[in-house]
Amino acid sequence: MSDVFNSPQARSTISAAFGIKPTAGQDVEELLIPKVWVPPEDPLASPSRLAKFLRENGYKVLQPRSLPENEEYETDQILPDLAWMRQIEGAVLKPTLSLPIGDQEYFPKYYPTHRPSKEKPNAYPPDIALLKQMIYLFLQVPEANEGLKDEVTLLTQNIRDKAYGSGTYMGQANRLVAMKEVATGRNPNKDPLKLGYTFESIAQLLDITLPVGPPGEDDKPWVPLTRVPSRMLVLTGDVDGDFEVEDYLPKINLKSSSGLPYVGRTKGETIGEMIAISNQFLRELSTLLKQGAGTKGSNKKKLLSMLSDYWYLSCGLLFPKAERYDKSTWLTKTRNIWSAPSPTHLMISMITWPVMSNSPNNVLNIEGCPSLYKFNPFRGGLNRIVEWILAPEEPKALVYADNIYIVHSNTWYSIDLEKGEANCTRQHMQAAMYYILTRGWSDNGDPMFNQTWATFAMNIAPALVVDSSCLIMNLQIKTYGQGSGNAATFINNHLLSTLVLDQWNLMRQPRPDSEEFKSIEDKLGINFKIERSIDDIRGKLRQLVLLAQPGYLSGGVEPEQSSPTVELDLLGWSATYSKDLGIYVPVLDKERLFCSAAYPKGVENKSLKSKVGIEQAYKVVRYEALRLVGGWNYPLLNKACKNNAGAARRHLEAKGFPLDEFLAEWSELSEFGEAFEGFNIKLTVTSESLAELNKPVPPKPPNVNRPVNTGGLKAVSNALKTGRYRNEAGLSGLVLLATARSRLQDAVKAKAEAEKLHKSKPDDPDADWFERSETLSDLLEKADIASKVAHSALVETSDALEAVQSTSVYTPKYPEVKNPQTASNPVVGLHLPAKRATGVQAALLGAGTSRPMGMEAPTRSKNAVKMAKRRQRQKESRQ
């Protein structure tokens, strides 16, 4: 293959096929194979230039807030609940915890890594070896058809026009400005309660579009949401003998960033600190609520003061998302991830994950449900969707997060919320938390949560992640909408899309390309755009049956010509047809597939990166995964991936590396591993393995707390409008609204109604006590008082979190960082005495030690003394 471009015949064939006309002295290879791309210099790679750009675009730069330096304390003293974990071999808890309790404070800094860059242009090189292999195979076909030529052309274009990497500061800044424009510009965000919705009416809609069940499983019920994180790990037995640990903490990616106050470290490295800070936050909140915090006077001030101490829980790191970006927009488009502080992520995940992870409910297993949550296109999943499209009834819709799919007038519409996270308000997230608590954390209508968690979910969590703040370089800046990537991102986006569909139903389902449909943007303050429309969708899908070509799933042979596809853009998947299985099967959208083939992401798992031979193992996994997700349908791509995977396998075998051991972790090495989660996939593509992967199986049984209205969203939307829809979750809803507030006195009426309903429940668990409930309109009228209280409390919480930031534009006065790319993380500098409430301070010491000179040591900051006194009073009250 080394001579692929050198022979006169090859030069002639390539020149003719791809329209290349080399001049004298030019090499065909030089013209066909893109050269190494050097990104343009980032014009905003300094704090002052970034701040100036943001100010010029009307973006708010906040006055910086400082953090206490971290100090070391013994883990067993801070987390006595988990002392037993330190005795277990391989325990994840370190002997000491590093906590933000120091006497000196600093301004936190975060310098993300942007690669490739002008200095390191080849950080993520394209797969030139794959391209050369495809060109070589192309030359072996005597009469190559247009389809084969298109494969080479598409891969070449992706290598030439795109690049994989994490963008630029300027790209991140442009994204921030664009998010602000969505939130405040053409259709500014609107709170749902001001539009006539209530938390309960939104919940009734989500009952259809995102039905959920209780946390845990039938044989292993979850513990109620009444504990601090450290008590979610339950030890049974003796660590010196037989023991068992019941883990009720949410699944968390321990390799991801820990966020403030641990810049540059992962959640796995700070798991003890994450639990300790979350523990203390919830315990302080609980204590203040028991004291009547939120009522007028000193108790209310204590709560707001406590929230100010934890300001950093609402400040995420502005992390650049690595993607395959267009080179032409390298300086203007970089997606941002709001990397949440790990305690914030943990506490919100404790609310959402136990419910959502055990709710595999979607269009495949519940009649009338339009949700694509936990949808997988394999094992017959995509075929079920195509059958749904082919059915004559319409209009109809599907929904997943910020994606909406509508079939109307035999036309398929793929609709995305425009910069979906930017459309979210704190009140939207309140409604989402209300839904998860009342529908998920509910046992036959009885709440499985306490006042502390209700208050956190309804009044505090939304303020932490929506319209909060973020850190980049030494700048603390405003965020508009929700921080992308927080633990409630999915459900918040899904709620926004549900409201769009609700309005569509109330309008009697107009065409998505009509002005009437477009008017929903203005009414809701939610922006969206039609990403793709396919007319005569049924005809095009039926044509796939007639045009299917021989291949792995149509004859059991390697393809010589690709079968046609219909690019539905269904969560990135297209449809093609298998004659052998007699069903429609998924292939990745062609553009996305060839873009993925053009640019490898490389080994992203740091723990695997250091293994000898891992690069060759990655090649095996990458090439076989590309075939599994759709490369099998494209002759040149399939054969090239197969050959390159085989070469990597032989290399590993010749060196004596344990191939089976590497491939056992293949899902960790593949960007597509999540698509095959739960499948026993043999990572060698054959007709048999593809047939097994796509063979239809019955969908998982649904897990819901109560039956879903089979009339679908349209029926519920209309019933809500008339007030005739019966509320079957009145008790838990009213209890939540009665407890999730900071001003207790204002919620007395709502609480009394909740207690009245609770007492009316008969002892017989099978009795239909819900028949005694009022119509929805009556119920919502009584809940309205508490709804207003919850909203008011959220505003107060937000003000407390922002109390130490400037209300005007701030011009940073820090020294220039000459080369941000080489700046270390974290940069701890600009030390100053602690003068105000900024951080946990000594609050955590109530569980362990105090300073040698006592809690009033003269070297302590005033705030540290205050927090230590608070802990001491709480400790004495428990004795």
From Swiss-Prot:
- Region labeled Disordered — which residues? 846-879
Localization in the cell: Virion
**UniProt binding sites for GTP:** G259, L260, P261, Y262, V263, G264, R265, T266
Keywords in UniProt for this one? Covalent protein-RNA linkage, GTP-binding, Nucleotide-binding, Nucleotidyltransferase, Phosphoprotein, RNA-directed RNA polymerase, Transferase, Viral RNA replication, Virion
Q: Which PROSITE patterns match?
A: RDRP_DSRNA_BIR (PS50524)
> Principal localization?
virion
* Enzyme Commission no: 2.7.7.48
Chain ranges of the RdRp catalytic domain: 398-598
Any single GO CC term annotated in Swiss-Prot or TrEMBL for this entry: virion component
InterPro entries, per this entry? Avibirnavurs_RdRp_C_sf, Birnavirus_RdRp_C, Birnavirus_RdRp_palm, Birnavirus_RdRp_palm_sf, Birnavirus_RdRp_thumb, Birnavirus_RdRp_thumb_sf, DNA/RNA_pol_sf
Q: Can you state which reaction this protein catalyses? A: RNA(n) + a ribonucleoside 5'-triphosphate = RNA(n+1) + diphosphate
Q: Name the source's superkingdom.
A: Viruses
Give the free-text PTM comment from the record. May exist in multiple phosphorylated forms.
The GO biological-process annotations, alphabetized, read as: viral genome replication
Record function comment: RNA-dependent RNA polymerase which is found both free and covalently attached to the genomic RNA. May also contain guanylyl and methyl transferase activities.
**Subunit annotation:** Interacts with VP3 in the cytoplasm.
Q: What is this protein called?
A: RNA-directed RNA polymerase
- Species of origin reads Avian infectious bursal disease virus (strain Chicken/Cuba/Soroa/1998) (IBDV)
Identify the coding gene: VP1
